[in-house]
From Swiss-Prot:
Domain named Reverse transcriptase: residues: 346-589
Keyword tags: DNA replication, DNA-binding, DNA-directed DNA polymerase, Endonuclease, Host-virus interaction, Hydrolase, Inhibition of host innate immune response by virus, Inhibition of host RLR pathway by virus, Magnesium, Metal-binding, Multifunctional enzyme, Nuclease, Nucleotidyltransferase, RNA-directed DNA polymerase, Transferase, Viral immunoevasion
Stated name of the protein: Protein P
Disordered: annotated segments: 241-263
Entry domain remark: Terminal protein domain (TP) is hepadnavirus-specific. Spacer domain is highly variable and separates the TP and RT domains. Polymerase/reverse-transcriptase domain (RT) and ribonuclease H domain (RH) are similar to retrovirus reverse transcriptase/RNase H. The polymerase/reverse transcriptase (RT) and ribonuclease H (RH) domains are structured in five subdomains: finger, palm, thumb, connection and RNase H. Within the palm subdomain, the 'primer grip' region is thought to be involved in the positioning of the primer terminus for accommodating the incoming nucleotide. The RH domain stabilizes the association of RT with primer-template.
Residue spans of biased composition, Polar residues class: 251-263
């Protein structure tokens, strides 16, 4: 007869009518019994002949591909003009007095952040935008380009102008080195950064030269020039001689020196009024003149006799005959003025040599499962986390559940702040730009690469007969719809572009580390400025707690103003006031302790409702089930040990079959959740110790000992002794000299013992006692005669590595005394 659920509960000593613990508990360590129970519950039978189940509820397993859903109406989120103040350390010191070593070190780490990969692999521009939605290629291309353009406008990205220069929008930092022209630097501002000169300025020609990549004194192009005379004359009509250079085709050939600027040379005269400062060549093009380059080398892209070809793929359609009803020339002729071929930022800086390549692909997805209206850019820089040259990212402290509860479980009022686009606050050094490149090869190549199997030869699409190869009904219809959304930006977005990150990107393992350092330093400063409140953060989630609601509101105003003064952008719509139960990191934390949030409890109920019995479930599904149940395991009677059979099946990559008893056991475990309570400081007065053959306890002045029927492994014996001490004395602080018991991880013990011990020792705090000083050492060896003096061992609750108490150094006298708002507390209250 199979083991029933009631019998199994009794076996695990979860019922009250169990016999004396000293007899019952050691039986659970018996290997034979564990094996027998595993067979009864069908836990060990991993080799099954029935086909595996690959889907349970929302959990999918092996061989299932979830098709990503493209939303043609995605809104691109707007990014505030985020600029974190460069003198953030000075501002914090004005606010709170001298910073501690830890705070200073952490803030220096991100001002600016640096990124040093060992090896960087460059990919062709075609791989810039991933064909993630094969059905919606063109739509996805333009949405992604628009997202990248938005980020560039918000100062998050640099735009590669030439191999050694980049432009960006927003306020410059001092480490962004101005663009030099030869030895003299031009248009120097007080900040030492080059801003764009006005169009009519005398620096125009110099600026054009530097755009053409001619920094001759730096020897960049000295070898290529070989004494050619380059001059810029404004007296020659563009039809007289075609300027040299075609649009870079994305194939990476940057030998045509003028290629980057050629896109600006042909612009309709209409644009004079509309774009006074967009193009560097405005002065010439608007008056119908162009840059002339003398003495073209004989091997130039085309001979002089050839008729001039406009370098812009998009605008070429204007002069060509429509090839069909769905020819792109119909769309290009919709507008007289399509705007500039390229936009340039407000500032130009020097950058290390950056090739015309990308180092990671991008694509769009839903912002989050609850918000499918807006899109989110996914950047794949996984090359830095893979292979022999992978970068090992720095580790940082993630607060565990007990530490969080010790810190935050109190009778405070709470609110949480939302930092908008938290990653994009932290500036990156320009030296990192060549490693973090995204971009695209332009619409013509993107469409050609995906629509035809033929190889695209370099510059092939520059000729007229190949121009119409890309015309198709699908492309025509897509562009017509997109024209309603983007208007004349279609032209701008159809050009190739290469962008490097100016702020830390999300797809690199360094970023979460830096963000965690940054927010923890800021919270540390806030805690010291307001000693009677609690500020805590994990990544971009910042919470504030205070004794009363009025106090919390004034604190909220003060902290918000402080954060805004540092240049940190908060999202006021997402500020949440929680009352006395804080919702943080998936938990609800109140004065009683912590519990999982409601939506997680609902997911668990749903999971058990859909869980099939007596059917082999694919280990990938088990992995997902364990992920969900593991989060709530600390709140159950038996904790993680109850999930051990599932862990074993995942490790051996076999299917797992839930027997009705095991499912009922887990179901009952997860339907009654117990809060994880805050640990309290106290004195340890109960000690336990064991040898393989016996155990001993000391409770105050009372001492006990006992023996095991058969010798046990030492860790098992120590665990049993701790369980006896807890059940005999009822004390919730125990002294032990065994590090495994101290760690409270009971997953390596025999399965039944681990489950039972977890319930007996739930809520117990352990203090380490060296063996030589442990008063229970003698009783465990069978000697009751000698009594050692009782130790007074204090227990301090741990807050893990999330150190809170940075003691405030004395504030220098020249700072005025801060006026405290009427505090409901007479004494400065310290967090628990």
């Amino acid at each position: 007869m199979p083991l029933s659920y009631q019998h199994f509960r009794r076996l695990l000593l979860l019922d009250d009518e169990a016999g004396p613990l000293e007899e019952e508990l050691p039986r659970l360590a018996d290997e034979g019994l564990n094996r027998h129970v595993a067979e009864e519950l069908n836990l060990g039978n991993l080799n099954v002949s029935i086909p595996w189940t690959h889907k349970v509820g929302n959990f999918t397993g092996l061989y299932s591909s979830t098709v990503p859903v493209f939303n043609p109406h995605w809104k691109t989120p707007s990014f505030p003009n985020i600029h974190l103040h460069q003198d953030i350390i000075k501002k914090c010191e004005q606010f709170v007095g001298p910073l501690t070593v830890n705070e200073k070190r952490r803030l220096q780490l991100i001002m600016p952040a640096r990124f040093y990969p060992k090896v960087t692999k460059y990919l062709p521009l075609d791989k810039g935008i991933k064909p993630y939605y094969p059905e919606h290629l063109v739509n996805h291309y333009f949405q992604t380009r628009h997202y990248l353009h938005t980020l560039w406008k918000a100062g998050v990205l640099y735009k590669r102008e030439t191999t050694h220069s980049a432009s960006f929008c927003g306020s410059p930092y001092s480490w962004e080195q101005e663009l030099q022209h030869g030895a003299e630097s031009f248009h120097q501002q007080s900040s030492g950064i080059l801003s764009r000169p006005p169009v009519g300025s005398s620096l125009q020609s110099k600026h054009c030269k530097s755009r053409l990549g001619l920094q001759s004194q730096q020897g960049l192009l000295a070898r290529r020039q070989q004494g050619r005379s380059w001059s810029i004359r404004a007296g020659i009509h563009p039809t007289a001689r075609r300027p040299f250079g075609v649009e870079p085709s994305g194939s990476g050939h940057t030998t045509n020196l003028a290629s980057k600027s050629a896109s600006c040379l042909h612009q309709s005269p209409v644009r004079k009024a509309t774009y006074p400062s967009v193009s560097t060549f405005e002065k010439h093009s608007s008056s119908g003149h162009a840059v002339e380059l003398h003495n073209l080398p004989p091997n130039s892209a085309r001979s002089q006799s050839e008729r001039p070809v406009s370098p812009c793929w998009w605008l070429q359609f204007r002069n060509s005959k429509p090839c069909s009803d769905y020819c792109l020339s119909h769309i290009v002729n919709l507008l007289e003025d399509w705007g500039p071929c390229a936009e340039h930022g407000e500032h130009h800086i020097r950058i290390p040599r950056t090739p015309a390549r990308v180092t990671g692909g991008v694509f769009l997805v839903d912002k989050n499962p609850h918000n499918t209206e807006e899109s989110r850019l996914v950047v794949d820089f996984s090359q830095f986390s893979r292979g022999n040259h992978r970068v090992s990212w720095p580790k940082f402290a993630v607060p565990n559940l007990q530490s969080l509860t010790n810190l935050l479980s109190s009778n405070l009022s709470w609110l949480s702040l939302d930092v908008s686009a938290a990653f994009y606050h932290l500036p990156l050094h320009p030296a990192a730009m060549p490693h973090l490149l995204v971009g695209s090869s332009g619409l013509s190549r993107y469409v050609a690469r995906l629509s035809s199997d033929s190889r695209i030869f370099n510059h092939q699409h520059g000729t007229m007969q190949n121009l119409h190869d890309s015309c198709s009904r699908n492309l025509y219809v897509s562009l017509l719809l997109l024209y309603q959304t983007f208007g004349r930006k279609l032209h701008l977005y159809s050009h190739p572009i290469i962008l490097g990150f100016r702020k830390i990107p999300m797809g690199v393992g360094l970023s979460p580390f830096l963000l965690a350092q940054f927010t923890s330093a800021i919270c540390s400063v806030v805690r010291r400025a307001f000693p009677h409140c609690l500020a805590f953060s994990y990544m971009d989630d910042v919470v504030l707690g205070a004794k009363t609601v009025h106090h919390l509101e004034s604190l909220f105003t003060a902290v918000t103003n402080f954060l805004l003064s540092l240049g940190i952008h908060l999202n006021p719509n997402k500020t949440k006031r929680w009352g006395y139960s804080l919702h943080f990191m998936g938990y609800v934390i109140g004065c009683y302790g912590s519990l999982p949030q409601d939506h997680i409890i609902q997911k668990i109920k749903e999971c058990f409702r859909k869980l099939p019995v007596n059917r082999p479930i694919d280990w990938k599904v088990c992995q997902r089930i364990v992920g969900l149940l593991g989060f709530a395991a600390p709140f159950t009677q038996c904790g993680y040990p109850a999930l051990m059979p599932l862990y074993a099946c995942i490790q051996s990559k076999q299917a797992f079959t839930f027997s009705p008893t095991y499912k009922a056991f887990l179901c009952k475990q997860y339907l009654n959740l117990y809060p994880v309570a805050r640990q309290r400081p106290g004195l340890c007065q109960v000690f336990a110790d064991a040898t393989p053959t016996g155990w001993g306890l000391v409770m105050g002045h009372q001492r006990m000992r006992g023996t095991f029927q058969a010798p046990l492994p030492i860790h098992t014996a120590e665990l049993l002794a701790a369980c006896f001490a807890r059940s005999r004395s009822g004390a919730n602080i125990l002294g032990t000299d065994n590090s495994v018991v101290l760690s409270r991880k009971y997953t390596s013990f025999p399965w039944l013992l681990g489950c039972a011990a977890n319930w007996i020792l739930r809520g117990t705090s352990f203090v380490y006692v060296p063996s030589a000083l442990n008063p229970a050492d003698d009783p465990s060896r069978g000697r009751l005669g000698l009594s050692r003096p009782l130790l007074r061992l204090p227990f301090r609750p741990t807050t893990g590595r999330t150190s809170l108490y940075a003691d405030s150094p004395s504030v220098p006298s020249h700072l005025p005394d801060r006026v405290h708002f009427a505090s409901p507390l007479h004494v400065a209250w310290r967090p628990p």
